[in-house]
Amino acid sequence: MSEPEVTYSTVRLHKSSGLQRLVSHEEIQGPGEAGYRKCSVPWQLTVRSLGIFCFLLLVTVAVLAVKIFQYSQHKQEIHETLNHNHNCSNMQSDIKLKEEMLRNKSIDCSPGEELLESLNREQNRWYSETKTDLDSSQDTGTGVKHWFCYGTKCFYFIMSKNTWSGCKQTCQHYSLPLVKIEDEDELKFLQFQVISDSYWIGLSYDKKKKQWAWIDNGPSKLDMKTRKMNFKPGGCIFLSKTRLEDTNCNNSYFCICGKKLDHFPG
């Protein structure tokens, strides 16, 4: 018996062109590139999500910054308003305090004003009495040109020239002494009042005491000034608009009589 013959044949399958291109393309790209391509879509979504989140975060931060700034401004305005109200309150307190001080000062000044009014009434009364004596004088050629008061003293200008002794007698006739100048201020005041002429005052040289003496033999705050003037012994002092000067007592000048009030009215 003979063995059966075995016939071998080769089967070749022809791939389609599309499938061949796909296979060849995958073979060319390799496995890494294919995986990257598969993952590229989720990565883009992540980036976009992060971008949107960052934008929203920036917007939120900006809104918060604006709110914080507005809160800070509002807080500052409230603080300034409170300070202004506090300052106004302090000013009102100061005004009330000053008003109270003014009221107290007005109360304190009331006795002084009453004293001044009483003093003026006393001066006017004294002048009225003295003026009556002067007006009733029978002497001719003698009169008062003007008079005025300074402090508690009144002055009378006798516009009739006479010697120092004659002026002394004229003033005494009206119950007035020759004027005694109490201090520097009174001297300046009298010099401001006098016209361009010379007037006897109540200062002369006392030959017995060998010193200058006022008509009442009392002291004066003007003594220091008169000592510095180095008046010559033996004379009398006259007053002009610019100076005090010693001269012969027999010279003829106008007279200034003066008298203090007896007391401050109580």
Swiss-Prot record:
Mostly expressed in NK cells, but also observed on NK T and memory T-cells. The keyword Disulfide bond applies. InterPro entries: C-type_lectin-like, C-type_lectin-like/link_sf, CTDL_fold, Ly49_N, Mouse_KLRs, NKR-like_CTLD. Coiled coil: none annotated. Pfam families: Lectin_C (PF00059), Ly49 (PF08391). Its main location: membrane. Homodimer; disulfide-linked. This is Killer cell lectin-like receptor 5. It comes from Mus musculus.
